[in-house]
A protein has these predicted regions:
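Sec-dependent N-terminal signal peptides
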Residues: 4-12
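N-terminal leader/targeting and pre-domain segments
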Residues: 10, 17-37, 120
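Short active-site neighborhood of thiol/selenol oxidoreductases, capturing the structured segment around
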Residues: 35-47
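The canonical Cys-X-X-Cys-His
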Residues: 44, 49-52, 93
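Thiol-based oxidoreductase modules, predominantly thioredoxin-like and allied folds used
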Residues: 44, 67-80
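Typically the conserved alpha-helix immediately C-terminal to a functionally engaged Cys/Sec
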Residues: 52-65
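Structural micro-motif
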Residues: 85-94
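Non-catalytic, surface beta->alpha helical segment in thiol-disulfide oxidoreductase systems
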Residues: 97-122
Length: 122
């Protein structure tokens, strides 16, 4: 019983972290950010996904460290957005600059790798 309660706690802890500081993706916000000349970072997630929570923690920190970047997330179950961005898996990370996709990864949670991708897009 104790292990079960710990398991349930972990699920809620990860789902809470995955929802922190995110701006939900919409085509309108995405297009506006691009027309404003911002670098746009988009990540896909799935509730109760531990790697999604890990990636989101890195992105939340990056959000405070990099200026002129817009961050969006979307639930991978949203098929309309997934098809628009050609995303098939949660933890897909996309970076757009000058209206072009300049970076794509699946499952990347390393702070160094994510920061390097963002820095090279600025």
């Amino acid at each position: 019983m104790k292990k079960f309660l710990i398991f349930i706690f972990c699920i809620f802890a990860f789902s809470t972290n995955a929802d922190e500081k995110k701006t939900t993706f919409t085509k309108e916000l995405f297009n506006k950010a691009q027309s404003d000349g911002k670098v746009v970072v988009v990540s896909s997630w799935l509730k109760y996904c531990s790697s999604c929570a890990s990636q989101m923690k890195v992105l939340n920190k990056a959000k405070n460290e990099f200026d002129n970047i817009e961050y969006f997330t979307f639930d991978i179950k949203n098929k309309e957005i997934a098809e628009l961005l050609n995303v098939q898996y949660q933890t897909t990370l996309l970076i757009f600059k000058d209206n072009k996709e300049v970076y794509r990864s699946i499952g990347e949670t390393s702070r160094d790798a994510i920061y390097k991708a963002i820095e090279s897009s600025i």
